[in-house]
Curated annotation (Swiss-Prot):
Family in the record: Belongs to the RRF family.
Classification lineage: Bacteria, Pseudomonadati, Bacteroidota, Bacteroidia, Bacteroidales
The protein's role, per its UniProt record: Responsible for the release of ribosomes from messenger RNA at the termination of protein biosynthesis. May increase the efficiency of translation by recycling ribosomes from one round of translation to another.
Gene name of this polypeptide: frr
UniProt cross-references to Gene3D superfamilies, sorted A to Z: 3.30.1360.40, Ribosome-recycling factor
UniProt protein name: Ribosome-recycling factor
C-alpha cells in the first residue's frame, strides 16, 4: 500500500522539476543586459560532436551591453559565428580575428512586451506541470483509499498536497514577477 508521505514527496519532486525547468527557461530569455547564460543553449560542432560554446571558447561579459567570445582554436571562429546567427537570439556577431563580440542592443518596448509574454507562457507551462503532479498524487491517494488507507489520512494528505501546490505556484509567480521587472526596466 502507498503511504501518504511518499505520495506527497513524489509530487514535490515533480514540482521541483517544474520550477527548475522554469528557472532554466527564464535564464535563456534576454532581458536587455549581457549574460553568458544567453549562449548556454547554443551548440557548435567541435571535431564531430555538438558541444556548448563555453567548451570551445572563453565567454565573458566585459560590460553590461556586450559578450566577448574568445575561441581557443582559430578554426572555431566561423563555426561559432554561424551557430549564433542560426540561433534565435537575434544578435549579429562581430569578428575581429581575435574575439567574437556580441553587442546586446537595448530592447524596444514592443520586444519587451514579446519577451514578457514569452515568460508568461513558460510560467503557464510550469504551472500546468505542477497541477498535473498534484492531480496524479490525488489519484494515487484515491487508489490507496481503495486499498485500505483511512479516509482521514487521505484528506489530511490532500490538504498537505494543496499547501505544497500553493507554495510552488507562489514560487512561480515570484520568478515571473522578477523576470518581468527585469525585462520591463529600461
Amino acid at each position: 500500500m502507498i503511504d501518504a508521505k511518499t505520495c506527497i514527496n513524489d509530487a514535490q519532486e515533480k514540482m521541483d522539476m517544474a520550477v527548475m525547468y522554469l528557472e532554466e527557461a527564464l535564464a535563456h530569455i534576454r532581458a536587455g543586459k549581457a549574460s553568458t547564460r544567453l549562449l548556454d543553449g547554443i551548440r557548435v560542432d567541435s571535431y564531430g560532436s555538438m558541444v556548448p560554446i563555453s567548451n570551445v571558447a572563453a565567454v565573458t561579459t566585459p560590460d553590461a551591453r556586450s559578450i566577448a567570445i574568445k575561441p581557443w582554436d582559430k578554426s572555431m571562429f566561423r563555426i561559432i559565428e554561424k551557430a549564433i546567427m542560426d540561433s534565435d537570439l537575434g544578435i549579429t556577431p562581430e569578428n575581429n580575428g581575435e574575439i567574437i563580440r556580441l553587442g546586446i542592443p537595448p530592447l524596444t518596448e514592443e520586444r519587451r512586451k514579446q519577451l514578457a509574454k514569452q515568460c508568461k507562457g513558460e510560467g503557464e507551462t510550469a504551472k500546468v506541470s505542477i497541477r498535473n503532479a498534484r492531480r496524479d498524487a490525488i489519484d494515487t491517494l484515491k487508489k490507496a483509499v481503495k486499498e485500505g488507507m483511512p479516509e482521514d489520512e487521505q484528506k489530511n494528505a490532500e490538504a498537505k498536497l494543496q499547501k505544497v501546490h500553493d507554495k510552488y505556484i507562489a514560487k512561480i509567480e515570484e520568478l515571473l514577477a522578477e523576470k518581468d521587472k527585469e525585462i520591463m526596466t529600461v
